[in-house]
Amino acid sequence: MDKQELTQLLQQVADGDVTPDDAALRLKMQPFQEIGAYAKVDFHRGIRQGVPEVIFGEGKAKEHILGIAREMLRSGQRTILITRLSAEAAAYLQTDLPLHYDSAARVGIIGELPAPGGKGRIVVATGGTSDIPVAEEAALTAEALGNAVTRLYDVGVSGLHRLLANLDTIMSARVIVAVAGMEGALPSVIGGLADCPVIAVPTSVGYGASLGGIAALLSMLNSCASGMSIVNIDNGFGAGYLASMINHLD
């Protein structure tokens, strides 16, 4: 149940279409559901935070992921997002559920994507093609949470004209997710051009001294561009989630 469904339920009670006892029963069943000894699915998260629970697939047995997803569907959740999902687990889920799987981003989505809402458009940009898997995790997360997303890939600082050729897209964005490895310069450049929040995502792409993304992370943390926030290395999900929150603010 999300905020809209809760409002509809309360309106039905006010209109006399649903009795208070029936409404109380529906709400009573909502907080969480314990599945065996391995999970407690949080059904109230959509009411508290505006977004239902997301499944982090890494480290979970494929049978456990299936059990959690089934319980979410049973509770009425229409779109289920699964991040860090292995190809093996995805194939297992697809034998039982309508799962769309992006193997590069390791993202699975069960059900239909919601119609885009929010105040505007989210732009997801990358420094290089190698950053696309992380960027796609951000883009697919944002789309699964009900946002219109524009992808702007391979526009890094080694060929700045590629970014400048897309200034209209940059300037019209509501939020920008800038994904880069190596020295992590792209978010600073975008932050100096855009009048909207920029979410920087360092990736682990790079040679030895990039230290698995630490160099890009430190570069972004020390940026002189204002209005920029930084998430963890390779955390496309965190960036897409935050971008969605910003895009849905009144």
Q: What annotation goes with each model-predicted range?
A:
Residues 1-86, 91, 95:
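Long amphipathic alpha-helical segments
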